[in-house]
Amino acid sequence: SIREYLCGEAMHGLKIPSSRSLIIFTGEEPVFRETTEPGAMIVRSASTHVRFGNFEYLCHNDKKELLPELMTHVIEEYFSEYNELENKFELFFESVVRKTAELIAHWQTVGFAHGVMNTDNMSILGETFDFGPFGFLENYQPNYICNHSDYQGRYAFNNQPNIGLWN
């Protein structure tokens, strides 16, 4: 959690869209990562907590009929300039793709490797959050993997643009 706080602040300082930390607190229970360590939680502030995974969830749980309702809500809340347009869903999609590409381009510029770019960790507004096992390149290593459990290199530094597009 402290790493996530520090990285969020660093990203903000680098002018890369990012969630910010409101509070960090510890608990009594140990957590099991690579080693056992004290548990901690972070409460983040972000422009939205709507993720790609919110849409994916509906698709994978036979609730596709709810997609237009979710998209309409998201457009009303975050893309109101598209509200009255006939092709608002298309414009929304294009905007999410553009914001994601811009975010990942920022990451690549500073050598940031996210580590867990699954759909639940990707913001529809192109903000960095859910840092997890992130890392920064100390020297140029295109295949750099910061996530110790990413044995296949799915989220390797040089694969981030592909994963962003796939998501």
Tell what function each PLM region has.
Residues 90-93, 162:
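Conserved N-terminal phosphate-binding loop of PLP-dependent enzymes in the Aspartate aminotransferase
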Residues 81-90, 150-158:
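Glycine- and acidic
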Residues 1-86, 102, 124-129, 136, ...:
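Conserved ATP-binding subdomain of kinase catalytic cores across diverse folds
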Residues 102-110:
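Mobile, glycine/GP-rich and aromatic-enriched active-site lid/loop segments adjacent to catalytic centers
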Residues 30, 36, 109-114, 118-165:
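Catalytic activation segment of kinase domains across protein kinase-like and atypical kinase folds
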